Structure formats: structure tokens, C-alpha cells
Design a protein with these regions (language model features):
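Cytosolic nucleotide-binding catalytic cores of signal-transduction proteins
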Residues: 18-20, 126, 151
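Secondary-structure edge/capping motif, primarily at the C-terminal ends of alpha-helices
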Residues: 90-94, 118-122, 149-153, 176
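Short, hydrophobic secondary-structure boundary micro-motifs
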Residues: 25-26, 91-93, 102, 158, ...
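Residues in the helix-turn-helix
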Residues: 40, 89
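C-terminal peripheral helix-coil segments that are non-catalytic and often amphipathic
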Residues: 148-186
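Amphipathic alpha-helical packing segments from all-alpha helical-bundle domains
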Residues: 77-78, 99-125, 129-144
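Short, residue-level hotspots on alpha-helical faces of the histone-fold
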Residues: 11, 54, 58, 108, ...
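An amphipathic alpha-helix adjacent to DNA-recognition modules
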Residues: 2-14, 18, 23-27, 32-35, ...
Length: 186
């Protein structure tokens, strides 16, 4: 069953990254920990970066769902709490470098999620050129927040952090969220 196998691979990676530096984790280690063959691993993922990024995608997808978050402020609070709770994983994930790095994935997936929410509120229209610039800066800033949070640079609770991050969002996008009809379909 694909769901169980994929979950086993993701869970294996999560166990490994709590005890092992990201750069030292190999596909072979993940396969052994998940008890899957090489062909099974590659049926689901192309490399360890994709496994790591699939974890964050699952977390963001979970919290961005309308039944869990009512707006961007709620989402920021949930993600900050999650990051604080899983600090060790975030710190090790931030060690990844290159095109498929965790940092690049956070930026790209956050940007695409904000774009999807905006399009859902604007009958398919995306960002204005100014909003595109603002969201680009905001999403890059979110990456820096995660990196600094992983290094325990902030002595701040999730609610206060969410308020501060929400205030930094582009004003024209702050109040957009999934429209009611999309929320009821999810």
C-alpha cells in the first residue's frame, strides 16, 4: 500500500535526522531504517532531499487546511509552534545545501502556497508586480526565521511571533485565505 510505504520512509528519515547530521544521512540508511528495498525507495523519492522536503510539505499542507488555520496569522502560529517543538529536526534540515536544500524548498513551497491562496481569492489572478516583490521578500524572510529559530536565536512564544510575522505581510494579502467554498470542499 503506497501510503504505508511512503509513511515508513518519511518516519525513518525523521528518526535518523534526530540523531544524525543531514549530510551524513544516506539513502541506504533511510532504506535500512524503513525496511524497504532500493527499488521501493526510488519508486517514491529520488533522493534524501526529496524525503526531507516531503516532510515539510506534509506539515504545511496539514496546517494550511481551512479547518486548522483561519488565516495567515494562525498558520504562522502553528508553524512556529511546530518548529519549536521539532527544533532538532529543523536545525539539522537547515544544514542541507544546494538546489534541493530545505531552505530553498521552504521558500518555493511557501511562495506557491501564498500564490494559490491569492488566486483562489481573485478568480485565478495572481500577485500584482508589487505584491510579487513583497511576497518574495516575505518568503525569503520566513526561511531566515526558520534558520534563526533552529539556532534558538529567538526567545519568543509562538503567538507573539505569529503576530509579528502577520504584521510584516503585504497588507493587500493579509486578509486573504481559502474562500468558503474551497474550505468546505477540503
Amino acid at each position: 500500500m503506497p501510503g504505508r510505504t511512503m509513511h515508513a520512509i518519511l518516519a525513518a528519515f525523521n528518526r535518523l535526522i534526530t540523531e544524525t547530521d543531514f549530510q551524513k544521512i544516506s539513502v541506504e540508511m533511510i532504506m535500512k531504517e524503513a525496511e524497504v528495498s532500493r527499488s521501493t525507495f526510488y519508486r517514491y523519492f529520488k533522493d534524501k532531499y526529496e524525503v526531507m522536503n516531503a516532510n515539510y510539505k506534509n506539515v504545511l499542507d496539514y496546517y494550511v487546511a481551512p479547518e486548522r488555520s483561519k488565516n495567515y496569522r494562525d498558520l504562522c502560529c502553528h508553524l512556529f509552534e511546530y518548529g519549536q517543538k521539532h527544533l532538532k529536526i529543523f536545525k539539522r534540515a537547515m544544514e542541507s545545501t544546494g538546489f534541493n536544500s530545505f531552505n530553498n524548498f521552504i521558500y518555493e513551497y511557501s511562495y506557491q502556497t501564498a500564490l494559490a491562496i491569492t488566486r483562489a481569492n481573485r478568480n485565478g489572478e495572481g500577485f500584482t508586480p508589487v505584491e510579487e516583490l513583497q511576497v518574495d521578500v516575505f518568503c525569503n524572510g520566513i526561511c531566515a526565521v526558520y534558520r534563526n529559530m533552529a539556532c534558538q536565536r529567538y526567545e519568543i512564544d509562538a503567538s507573539t511571533a505569529a503576530d509579528a510575522l502577520y504584521e510584516m505581510m503585504p497588507e493587500s494579502l493579509k486578509h486573504d485565505w481559502w474562500p468558503e467554498e474551497e474550505a468546505s470542499q477540503g
